[in-house]
Swiss-Prot record:
<keyword id="KW-0457">Lysine biosynthesis</keyword>
<keyword id="KW-0220">Diaminopimelate biosynthesis</keyword>
<comment type="subunit">
    <text>Homotrimer.</text>
</comment>
<dbReference type="InterPro" id="IPR037133">
    <property type="entry name" value="THP_succinylTrfase_N_sf"/>
</dbReference>
<dbReference type="InterPro" id="IPR005664">
    <property type="entry name" value="DapD_Trfase_Hexpep_rpt_fam"/>
</dbReference>
<feature type="binding site">
    <location>
        <position position="146"/>
    </location>
    <ligand>
        <name>substrate</name>
    </ligand>
</feature>
<dbReference type="InterPro" id="IPR018357">
    <property type="entry name" value="Hexapep_transf_CS"/>
</dbReference>
<protein>
    <recommendedName>
        <fullName>2,3,4,5-tetrahydropyridine-2,6-dicarboxylate N-succinyltransferase</fullName>
        <ecNumber>2.3.1.117</ecNumber>
    </recommendedName>
</protein>
<dbReference type="InterPro" id="IPR011004">
    <property type="entry name" value="Trimer_LpxA-like_sf"/>
</dbReference>
<dbReference type="Pfam" id="PF14805">
    <property type="entry name" value="THDPS_N_2"/>
</dbReference>
<dbReference type="Pfam" id="PF14602">
    <property type="entry name" value="Hexapep_2"/>
</dbReference>
<keyword id="KW-0808">Transferase</keyword>
<comment type="pathway">
    <text>Amino-acid biosynthesis; L-lysine biosynthesis via DAP pathway; LL-2,6-diaminopimelate from (S)-tetrahydrodipicolinate (succinylase route): step 1/3.</text>
</comment>
<keyword id="KW-0012">Acyltransferase</keyword>
<keyword id="KW-0028">Amino-acid biosynthesis</keyword>
<comment type="similarity">
    <text>Belongs to the transferase hexapeptide repeat family.</text>
</comment>
<dbReference type="GO" id="GO:0019877">
    <property type="term" value="P:diaminopimelate biosynthetic process"/>
</dbReference>
Length: 282
């Protein structure tokens, strides 16, 4: 197959002419899109990569490949439902045609009720409780995805992360220019928290239960007063909070507005030695 540079060129050109691409399209375009998704599925390439300077580089062409996949493939019966029922979709399961040897080689745990779509990568020693992992996502080694957590399209999850029950990580296929949601290594995301809109949770950070982080969320360090937008600093401990409301026209106190509050910052050694509950205690 073509190298990655050629693959990118073919997919970029095809995406520019995407209105002409149909389920009947064959040849180079179909082969390139399928090859790109297979590479994503194996973890040989990924939608976003962390650079040496700590910044994340997003390969937009891979997101385009995922979108082209929808144009190239018709709806189809997908087996595996409860009591022999089916689903109706364009994207097969990651586990289609897998046998015992495939699971042993992949070396991660997938509990019944888990859904992982083709092109998502799951690294060794990951534990997937009944959860949903969407296209193009990357989940690195030793991470726990707890019950009813959702990992959105192209989300990037680091090593030894804990996504608690009901956590939601947003997907970013559209708008196309959006960056993926990123959770770096050794983070803990508390139950029912949401991280969306391409926000980054930096290494070792702890989000308490019910923290919501989007691009408009103010993340306030209560010690320094510093305000962060779109990114939680490394080794921060974050809980839900609120900002005082502005006075209403009649002079009454207005409603408070949601924010996230950094209650403390810890170093790596403290983070490793201290339990999550102790970190979250004020």
């Amino acid at each position: 197959m073509t190298n990655l540079t050629q693959l990118e060129m073919i997919i970029e050109k095809a995406f520019d002419d995407r209105d002409s691409i149909k389920t009947t399209t064959k040849g180079e375009i179909r082969e390139s899109v399928e090859h790109a998704l297979n590479l994503l599925d194996k973890g040989e390439i990924r939608v976003a990569e962390r650079q040496k300077n700590g910044q994340w580089h997003v390969h937009q062409w891979l997101k385009k490949a995922v979108l082209l996949f929808f144009r190239l493939n018709p709806m189809q019966i997908i087996a595996g439902g409860v009591n022999g029922t089916y689903w109706w979709d364009k994207v097969p399961s990651k586990f289609s045609n897998w046998q015992e040897t495939d699971f042993k080689k992949a070396n991660f745990r997938s509990v019944p009720g888990t859904i992982v779509r083709h092109s998502a990568y799951i690294a060794p020693n990951v534990i997937l409780m009944p959860s949903f992992v969407n296209l193009g996502a990357f989940i690195d080694e030793g991470t726990m995805v707890d019950t009813w957590a959702t990992v959105g399209s192209c989300a990037q999850i680091g090593k030894h992360v804990h996504l608690s029950g009901g956590v939601g990580l947003g997907g970013v296929l559209e708008p196309l220019q959006a960056n993926p949601t990123i959770i770096e290594d050794h983070c803990f995301i508390g139950a029912r928290s949401e991280v969306v809109e391409g926000c980054i949770i930096r290494e070792g950070a702890v989000l308490g239960m019910g923290v919501f982080i989007g691009k408009s969320t103010k993340i306030i360090d209560r010690t320094t007063g510093e305000v962060f937008i779109g990114e939680v600093p490394a080794y921060s401990v974050v809980v839900p909070g609120s900002l005082p409301g502005k006075p209403l026209p009649n002079g009454e106190v207005g409603p408070n507005l949601y924010c996230a509050v950094i209650v403390k910052r810890v170093d790596q050694k403290t983070r490793e030695k201290t339990s999550i509950n102790d970190l979250l205690r004020d």
